Amino acid sequence: MEPSSWSGSESPAENMERMSDSADKPIDNDAEGVWSPDIEQSFQEALAIYPPCGRRKIILSDEGKMYGRNELIARYIKLRTGKTRTRKQVSSHIQVLARRKSRDFHSKLKDQTAKDKALQHMAAMSSAQIVSATAIHNKLGLPGIPRPTFPGAPGFWPGMIQTGQPGSSQDVKPFVQQAYPIQPAVTAPIPGFEPASAPAPSVPAWQGRSIGTTKLRLVEFSAFLEQQRDPDSYNKHLFVHIGHANHSYSDPLLESVDIRQIYDKFPEKKGGLKELFGKGPQNAFFLVKFWADLNCNIQDDAGAFYGVTSQYESSENMTVTCSTKVCSFGKQVVEKVETEYARFENGRFVYRINRSPMCEYMINFIHKLKHLPEKYMMNSVLENFTILLVVTNRDTQETLLCMACVFEVSNSEHGAQHHIYRLVKD
């Protein structure tokens, strides 16, 4: 990676001045029952994150450990709610829901031929596949299992869980109120029914479900604070994080937001969001809503390191330029440009920008944000704070990926969260 530097003028001080079902009986001593609303919410989120995998194990990239699906669901419930559910309890609940879902299909299908066909497909599916499958529901136009919402703060967008790794960074879209008009993902109708184990399409599952195109894909992105507790240990806190995810064809496609809704939040001059989108390719543009985790102790000491790590991959060998523009009230405040060369790993070209130092402006901005007494004050400041990330092919100047990032402060119990949208212009 070539040396890089931040350039900008406005100080953060100046900027801050401007800116469940009752039939399911409990089987342990939990007063709310085994599948209370918060546990059911986490259970449904985990179903969306971890696709059915039969007897195979899922490897968590952050840990390198192998887990069965039910283990991961139980683990996720523990992380989200603090309540312990065993993998056997998870398995039992999946079977209960599968039977209920089968009855639901059966009762709503009036045509006997369609009913027989649906039952034939479901007979070949496991309980996990029936509970996780969305294809049959979508094609029949049947409602899915209702999911309770987070008790949210104003300004959160409506929506569902997306893929991500459980832990300190959840890929969740907290919901209540809608900031921009959201367009649901549209898929072409397919006649008949398909079991969850149907042959995979020729395109990879991540396309249309994550940040990426056929030329370049974002694998991971994080902004973090690393503090040295003692000579032998470091504490790492993630402000924002997009983790590596194992996408499934049953995962929903990304929703769309009209790019004109956010033009005023980003620079309009040469190289701004509007000009870039006009040049295209338009499938390379994404909006990321981050709920930043500021629930950490920030100390002014020499042992603190503020950094950003990102990783991309491609089937092509390129030299890429990564531009990060920090914006306030739609105006660029500071920009960092980095050049990265490809490394061939496991049959693909990898571009990794590791532990890139944050600029002084961002560090001071985080400090001042933390000193605000109320969360609504922080969110008020963040309404006028955005970041534009643009990855370009250095030789052809083609835009490979563009991520327009907007921010709110996460509820401390939820940790860092995010949700991804496609940017379109209808």
UniProtKB/Swiss-Prot annotation:
GO terms for biological process: embryonic organ development; hippo signaling; positive regulation of cell growth; positive regulation of DNA-templated transcription; positive regulation of miRNA transcription; positive regulation of transcription by RNA polymerase II; protein-containing complex assembly; regulation of transcription by RNA polymerase II. SMART domains: TEA. The modification N6-lactoyllysine is found at residue 108. Pfam families: TEA, YBD. InterPro entries: TEA/ATTS_dom (IPR000818), TEA/ATTS_sf (IPR038096), TEC1_TEAD_TF (IPR050937), TEF_metazoa (IPR016361), YBD (IPR041086). Residues 1-31 are annotated as: Disordered. Residues 28-104 bind DNA. The modification N-acetylmethionine is found at residue 1. Lactylation by AARS1 promotes nuclear localization and stabilization of YAP1, leading to increased Hippo signaling pathway. Delactylated by SIRT1. Residues 15-28 have a biased composition (Basic and acidic residues). Its main location: nucleus. Residues 1-12 have a biased composition (Polar residues). It is linked to Sveinsson chorioretinal atrophy: Characterized by symmetrical lesions radiating from the optic disk involving the retina and the choroid. Interacts with YAP1 and WWTR1/TAZ. Transcription factor which plays a key role in the Hippo signaling pathway, a pathway involved in organ size control and tumor suppression by restricting proliferation and promoting apoptosis. The core of this pathway is composed of a kinase cascade wherein MST1/MST2, in complex with its regulatory protein SAV1, phosphorylates and activates LATS1/2 in complex with its regulatory protein MOB1, which in turn phosphorylates and inactivates YAP1 oncoprotein and WWTR1/TAZ. This is Transcriptional enhancer factor TEF-1. It comes from Homo sapiens. The gene is TEAD1.
